[in-house]
């Protein structure tokens, strides 16, 4: 019993005791009400993490960290952990040459020009980008004795080959406005393990349109960015973010841009506040249900992505 409680109970005053008990009861009721009304977190079932096949990971990276023994593939979380623990110090990319990491020429140039305290430094928020660059998309997969080659702009050929080899079959019951296929768990496992993710299916049924979209994404090169080019320096002033000019282009960090914009979006209305929108409406014409990816597109200049192959 607390000292204050003891003093109250030692008091002869019935009035004081009544007041004390009333207060305690009220506090207990408030506490129960708060617990009852607090949102309960739904138990989330964690999906098993995919393993990246060794032949799809940078060979120098595999060799340096002795990953050749991982015959069933390497967890992506392990790759991220190795990158962060070996190439980063105090939350930032270590200075110097890193032969295993894939850094674009413009990224190397920016790092060479900025000081260690700059917010433009590559930091732990970029670990996932660097880890993803250490793997490449599969150019083929095998299923029941047949090899299927994944090439951009040849998605129709892949689907037709799967049908020809009876790897997938038409679902006549659901095929009305769109063609639907039945796809086995076995083939879905091949997709998950070789192409890093599964297409969206329901009861092993998938539409041709959705399967087509899946293969388009599976053959698309990684386009994750660390730095982006702003359309003009006024954007940087509005968002109050650091930039660097190289060859007349204004560069900033993608993560800085995303963070700054996100801070201006109301989480309930999904809109910018009026004052901020007024300052940036020259670039963003619509303030209804802001799409962050689209906003980034409006504020930046598209660049040609030079594909980095995994060796």
Curated annotation (Swiss-Prot):
Q: Name one GO molecular function term.
A: DNA binding
Establish whether keyword DNA-binding is in the entry: yes
Keywords attached to this entry = DNA-binding, Late protein, Virion
Q: Which residues cross the membrane?
A: none
An example of a Pfam family matching this protein is: Pox_I1
Functional note: Late DNA-binding protein which binds to the hairpin form of the viral telomeric sequence. Required for the production of mature virions (MV).
Q: What is this protein called?
A: Telomere-binding protein I1 homolog
- Protein species of origin: Fowlpox virus (strain NVSL)
The lineage, from the top, is: Viruses, Varidnaviria, Bamfordvirae, Nucleocytoviricota, Pokkesviricetes
């Amino acid at each position: 019993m607390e000292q204050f409680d003891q003093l109250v109970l030692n008091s002869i005053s019935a009035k004081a005791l009544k007041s004390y008990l009333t207060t305690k009861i009220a506090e207990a009721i408030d506490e129960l009400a708060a617990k009852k009304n607090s949102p309960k977190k739904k138990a989330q079932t964690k999906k098993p993490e995919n393993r990246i096949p060794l032949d799809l990971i940078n060979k120098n990276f595999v060799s340096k960290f002795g990953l050749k023994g991982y015959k069933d593939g390497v967890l992506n979380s392990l790759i991220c952990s190795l990158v962060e623990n070996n190439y980063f110090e105090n939350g930032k990319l270590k200075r110097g040459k890193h032969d295993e990491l894939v850094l674009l020429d413009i990224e190397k140039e920016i790092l060479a020009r900025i000081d260690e305290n700059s917010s433009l430094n590559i930091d732990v928020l970029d670990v996932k980008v660097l880890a993803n660059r250490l793997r490449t998309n599969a150019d083929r997969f095998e299923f029941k004795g047949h090899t299927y080659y994944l090439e951009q702009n040849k998605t129709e050929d892949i689907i037709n080959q799967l049908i020809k080899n009876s790897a997938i079959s038409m679902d006549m019951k659901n095929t009305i406005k769109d063609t639907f296929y039945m796809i086995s768990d076995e083939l879905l496992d091949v997709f998950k393990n070789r192409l890093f993710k599964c297409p969206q299916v329901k009861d092993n049924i998938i539409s041709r349109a959705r399967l087509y979209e899946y293969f388009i994404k599976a053959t698309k090169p990684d386009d994750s960015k660390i730095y982006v080019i702003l359309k003009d320096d006024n954007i940087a002033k509005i968002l109050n973010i650091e930039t660097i000019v190289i060859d007349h282009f204004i560069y900033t960090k993608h993560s800085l841009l995303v963070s700054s914009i996100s801070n201006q979006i109301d989480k309930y209305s999904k809109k910018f506040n009026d004052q901020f929108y007024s300052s940036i409406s020259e670039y963003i014409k619509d303030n209804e249900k802001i799409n962050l990816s689209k906003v980034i597109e409006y504020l930046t200049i598209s660049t040609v992505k030079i594909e980095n192959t995994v060796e």
